[in-house]
């Protein structure tokens, strides 16, 4: 119903949604961010990509693995970008960046959420291994994206083949 209100008001407005995959919403959304593990099939994602619709993956208070919790293995933050790349998504949505609890330097819990779920950096711009690993994954993603773009322009079939293996 809400989508119809938006479409009836202005057909040019873009509609986005973050949540579990619902096939019935697919054609209605310009930008769909799927919860990791609740995503479309690879074939459905390829159709979204071919029609120019944005698709991203996100994690939040779940799933427990992979994630960016204080107790998560740091490599998970980097691995997520490789997963995003492998499945042809446009990017990764981190649901919270700086929602700090009262004393973030002493206690990373925020309400009932897992420790570290609500922030990736500490007050005052202090980084942490979780953020740095996520950043490394983003850099990896961008490097491969740029290499794919350059090899497509060059027509180098061998290089294109190697990049498809990633």
What kind of feature is each model-predicted range?
Residues 1-103:
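Catalytic-core regions of glycoside hydrolase
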Residues 1-21, 89, 105-166:
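Catalytic domains of carbohydrate-active enzymes that cleave complex glycans
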